[in-house]
């Protein structure tokens, strides 16, 4: 089963489209590991997948603590995503992807700015060989995202002027990406990009809560998966916070107009 279908099955099974960003503030490796393990255990009934970032990879090590957390997630039937934003030459990109896949990650996030040939082609090739997924950044959630993702570009093929994010959405379709990251902080961009990507490339939206994005607006605009970090991991009651996000998203999905 492809990563995209594994995500659909996990969401269906958990009755949740919430992806936990397992991000914690710096601490000793021992404390980070223990807190992550507990968090994952208490929050897992409300999520469909877990996204890891450098917050844990750097202090815990990929094949040490992180691999144990990956096994824990897998035991709960939760796919895992490595948010490594791959962004180098092809040979390096392939090695990065291979390491994360060998450790047990089900998907990696990559940056389409580097292009296909000797860029992301080797990553998609490796993912195909190992039956894993690749999710592309299409419009990030932070304030300065417009400087890169929002700039006007003239495409080589048609000479037409487009926004960088529109070009990236076309690439996500052409390259067979398993998902596209579009910030929940820009619901109008989600709407626009959903009309290009349709359901072929599901939208993953980070930026909910701590960055000001709203989960209902992301649902209404066409996002499929909702990535939440600090608003859960640093909440007084992480399980309750996750449950609240899950319920809000499910309610908004039920009331979503059919044109989205
Ligand atoms: P938080 O909910 O705490 O803001 O965390 C969001 C997570 O998603 C972080 O791991 C961040 O690096 C990641 N992320 C993001 O916030 N915006 C993007 O456009 C892409 C991301 O991967």
Question: How should these model regions be labeled?
Answer:
Residues 24-26, 88-181, 200:
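Conserved anion-binding
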Residues 20, 50, 83, 108, ...:
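Conserved, mostly hydrophobic/aromatic
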Residues 1-81, 155-167, 171, 177, ...:
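Conserved N-terminal beta1-alpha1 strand-loop-helix module at the mouth
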Residues 56-72, 89-95, 112-132, 184-197, ...:
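Active-site-adjacent beta->alpha loops and helix N-cap segments on the catalytic face
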Residues 180, 184-232:
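A C-terminal functional module that forms or caps the active site or interfaces directly
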Residues 21-27, 53-57, 85-89, 113, ...:
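Active-site beta-loop-alpha junctions enriched in small/polar residues
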Residues 73-85, 131-134, 196-206:
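Short beta-strand/loop segments at the ligand-binding rim of alpha/beta enzyme cores
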Residues 216-222, 230-260:
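C-terminal helical cap(s) of enzyme catalytic domains, especially alpha/beta-barrels
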């Amino acid at each position: 089963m492809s990563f995209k279908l594994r995500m659909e099955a996990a969401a269906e099974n958990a009755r949740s489209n919430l992806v936990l960003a397992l991000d914690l503030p710096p601490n000793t490796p021992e404390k980070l590991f223990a807190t992550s393990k507990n968090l994952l255990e208490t929050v897992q009934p409300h999520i469909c997948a877990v996204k890891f970032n450098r917050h844990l990879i750097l202090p815990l090590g990929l094949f040490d603590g992180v691999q144990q957390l990956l096994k824990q997630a897998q035991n709960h039937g939760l796919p895992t995503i490595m948010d490594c934003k791959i962004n180098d030459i092809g040979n390096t990109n392939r090695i990065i992807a291979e390491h994360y896949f060998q450790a047990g990650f089900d998907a990696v996030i990559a940056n389409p700015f580097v292009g296909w040939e000797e860029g992301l082609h080797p990553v998609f090739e490796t993912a195909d060989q190992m039956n894993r997924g690749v999710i592309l950044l299409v419009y990030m959630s932070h304030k300065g995202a417009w400087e890169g993702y929002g700039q006007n570009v003239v495409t080589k093929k048609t000479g037409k002027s487009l926004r960088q994010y529109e070009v990236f959405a076309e690439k996500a379709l052409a390259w067979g990406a398993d998902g596209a990251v579009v910030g929940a902080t820009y619901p109008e961009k989600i709407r626009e990009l959903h009309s290009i990507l349709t359901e072929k490339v599901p939208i993953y939206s980070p930026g909910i809560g701590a960055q000001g994005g709203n989960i209902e607006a992301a649902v209404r605009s066409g996002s499929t998966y909702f990535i939440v970090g600090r608003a859960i991991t640093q909440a007084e009651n992480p399980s309750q916070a996750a449950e609240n996000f899950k319920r809000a998203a499910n309610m908004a999905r039920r009331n979503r107009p059919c044109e989205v």
